[in-house]
Amino acid sequence: MDYKTAGVDVEAGRAFVNRIRKSVEATHRPEVVGGLGGFGGLMRLPAGLKKPLLVSGTDGVGTKLELAQDHGGHHNVGIDLVAMCVNDVITSGAEPLFFLDYMATGALSPEAMATVVEGIAEGCRGSGCALLGGETAEMPGFYPSGRYDLAGFCVAVVEEEQLIDGRQIRAGDRILGIASSGIHSNGFSLVRRVLTHAGANAETTFGPSNQPLIESLLTPTQLYGRLVKTLLETGTPIHGMAHITGGGLPENLPRCLPEGLQAIVTPSSWTRPAIYDWLQSHGDIPERDLWHTFNLGIGYCLIVPEEGVSIAEKACESEGMQAWTIGRIEASSGGDGKGSVLGLPA
């Protein structure tokens, strides 16, 4: 008996590492020290920082992975993994520095795993951060053969005096909603349930233009890092930011609001993507559940003073992203308490 007969293929692991090497190294920033294969990734802090704060985040892709593995969407979930982490840490105004990934699988498929890492590398390049290392765990008997799970870890940096933490938010500020690219990576346990209930398959289409349903669902999560960097470099006065993930607008907008303020959102200010109408009609999903599960077309929010709206809109346009003024900030009715979101289904 040997390790391979026990279910762990060391040679396949080596082939996997050799295939991903170029993709990984292509993400490296000038601050990276050394290459792939060491026990730990090394990186210098960018030069010129006076009082740097490190910002960390970790996340996964959830059960979107099952849909991706059933339909060959390995590359896309690699991008998703980066986006879920990077989009969180940039809400503080931080610049992503490096990313680490963890993959666990029942039996290593070098082709599929390498495709995932190539997606991760694409996400890192699109976010300006280095893929500094990772771990691939082959765990026969623990995970089914051909199935894998992913986790990502991101570290970013921001000057302490430039930290965006919501303390500057004031009544009268505007909420700018940035378009999502689709469902992103939240709510897929409900999505999969609806797909099963509706008998949907790879041939199913939706909407007036008959878009392929599965392909649309597997669209990668939008990366907002470059946009935020552009906004900050052009001097856009950003008072707060929110990444709209699980819980939707009602549960994520309040996370950046200080005591005594609330958000007033106008749902008619943007057009809800057709995918949500399909899910609601085929799954009989209550309106409130839609709002508390999905992003409904808004993947990221900026809170800016009224005079900053046009600046932010131009920056979004320059990055090819659609944006709408979707609401405003007001004093909460009691004058205290940490933010709520009004204007949405209760």
From Swiss-Prot:
The keyword Nucleus does not apply. CDD domains: PurM (cd02196). Pathway: Purine metabolism; IMP biosynthesis via de novo pathway; 5-amino-1-(5-phospho-D-ribosyl)imidazole from N(2)-formyl-N(1)-(5-phospho-D-ribosyl)glycinamide: step 2/2. One of its GO terms (molecular function) is phosphoribosylformylglycinamidine cyclo-ligase activity. Keywords: ATP-binding, Cytoplasm, Ligase, Nucleotide-binding, Purine biosynthesis. SUPFAM superfamilies: PurM C-terminal domain-like, PurM N-terminal domain-like. It is found in: Cytoplasm. InterPro entries: PurM-like_C_dom, PurM-like_C_sf, PurM-like_N, PurM-like_N_sf, PurM_cligase. It is an enzyme of class 6 (ligase). One of its GO terms (biological process) is adenine biosynthetic process. It catalyses: 2-formamido-N(1)-(5-O-phospho-beta-D-ribosyl)acetamidine + ATP = 5-amino-1-(5-phospho-beta-D-ribosyl)imidazole + ADP + phosphate + H(+). Its EC number is 6.3.3.1. GO terms for cellular component: cytosol. Coiled coil: none annotated. Its main location: cytoplasm. Belongs to the AIR synthase family. This is Phosphoribosylformylglycinamidine cyclo-ligase. It comes from Synechococcus sp. (strain CC9311).
